[in-house]
């Protein structure tokens, strides 16, 4: 259940109550693709990093270790040791981006595993069954992730099929949630808005999926190479047609500036691999902008990564030490950097919420939508 607390323009301060805990919004989901944050960060660590929600990947967990294995271990939360909410994506994005030799029809998609090439079929029912086995808090509907930009006629055809798939997802989830053998009988379902960058298709598709009265709604198919301004335009066009009483999730976004801009346009929830992926290569997010800790100028720098940060990394280690760890190939350097970046992202959303609570979001936006894009 979503509760809207207050608004500042289009920006929304709210809460989303789930069977596994309440999520303060706007919020960021920490990406644990295969049930773990890449970079050696555990579920225990996440507690100290202000993580609210963990996002796991249906496609990858289905292939390894297998959703039935996870189910036999009590579901994804028990399996990973994370007791908060977990969102699983449907596997659609990976099917259309990683898998080989795809064949799509009304029933679903046949594809070859990117690991060993064996044939797999996934459709709405299969995606819901896998996510039910994983016992996540929130399941994402199975959709077609088309290229951006895509031809207008194919985009329309794809969105119509995705809507039919969504209705099948809802019916299958209702069935699964009624079974005695289901671990999480209160699993929630989010639908995904698609439509490439076409305003009319995006709006028509949003009008369709909102009629199904789902637990939440996502904007998909963005942050895949289009200019940021085009992404913002699509959000602005779709947002007025999204239900006020449901959370809005922008999938796969993004940079700190992207997040601030999207919050200003009415988005509540985000996920992105950027904080962990960038950290593994020495790219650090700070309140002054981003930095590359591998640069020679940090060799004798005794300051923490960010003097405004009180994460475990910044409270205990210097830039010089972390640079040394990276240069020496020590895994600890990657781990400390990932912990810092995740803490930064979670704190960014915390500060956004505080600014909305204090009616100072306009000032926050004016300051940080510029500063956080800097390279230092």
Model-inferred region functions:
Residues 21, 162-169, 209, 238, ...:
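Hydrophobic alpha-helical packing residues
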Residues 1-17, 23-32, 37-40, 143-149, ...:
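C-terminal extensions of enzymes
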Residues 21, 54, 89, 131, ...:
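Conserved, mostly hydrophobic/aromatic
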């Amino acid at each position: 259940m979503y509760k809207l607390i207050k608004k500042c323009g289009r920006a929304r301060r709210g809460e989303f109550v789930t069977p596994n805990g309440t999520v303060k919004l706007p919020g960021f989901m920490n990406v644990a693709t295969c049930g773990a944050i890449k970079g050696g960060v555990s579920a225990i660590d996440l507690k100290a990093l202000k993580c609210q929600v963990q996002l796991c990947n249906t496609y990858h967990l289905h292939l390894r270790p297998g959703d039935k294995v996870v189910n036999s271990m009590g579901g994804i939360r028990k399996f990973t040791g994370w007791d908060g909410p977990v969102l699983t994506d449907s596997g659609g994005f990976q099917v259309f981006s990683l898998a080989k030799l795809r064949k799509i029809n009304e029933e679903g998609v046949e594809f070859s595993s990117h690991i060993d090439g064996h044939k797999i079929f996934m459709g709405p029912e299969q995606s819901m069954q896998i996510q039910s086995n994983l016992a996540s808090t929130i399941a994402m509907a199975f959709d077609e992730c088309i290229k951006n930009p895509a031809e207008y006629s194919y985009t329309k055809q794809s969105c119509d099929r995705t809507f039919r798939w969504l209705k099948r997802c809802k019916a299958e989830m209702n069935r699964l949630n009624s079974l005695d053998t289901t671990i999480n009988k209160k699993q929630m379902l989010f639908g995904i808005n698609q439509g490439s960058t076409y305003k009319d298709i995006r709006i028509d598709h949003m009008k369709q999926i909102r009629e199904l009265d789902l637990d939440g709604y996502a904007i998909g198919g963005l942050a895949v190479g289009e200019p940021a301004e085009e992404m913002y335009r699509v959000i602005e066009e779709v947002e007025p047609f999204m239900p006020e009483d449901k959370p809005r999730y922008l999938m796969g976004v993004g940079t700190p500036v992207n997040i601030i801009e999207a919050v200003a346009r009415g988005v509540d929830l985000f996920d992105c691999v950027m904080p962990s992926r960038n950290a593994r290569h020495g790219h650090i997010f700070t309140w002054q902008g981003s930095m590359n800790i591998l640069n020679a100028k940090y060799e004798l720098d005794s300051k923490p990564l960010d003097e405004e940060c009180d994460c475990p990394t910044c409270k205990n280690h210097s830039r010089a030490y972390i640079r040394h760890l990276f240069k020496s190939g020590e895994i600890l350097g990657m781990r400390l950097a990932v912990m810092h970046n995740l803490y930064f992202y979670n704190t960014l959303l915390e500060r956004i919420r505080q600014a909305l609570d204090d009616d100072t979001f306009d000032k926050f936006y004016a300051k940080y939508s510029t500063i956080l894009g800097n390279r230092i």
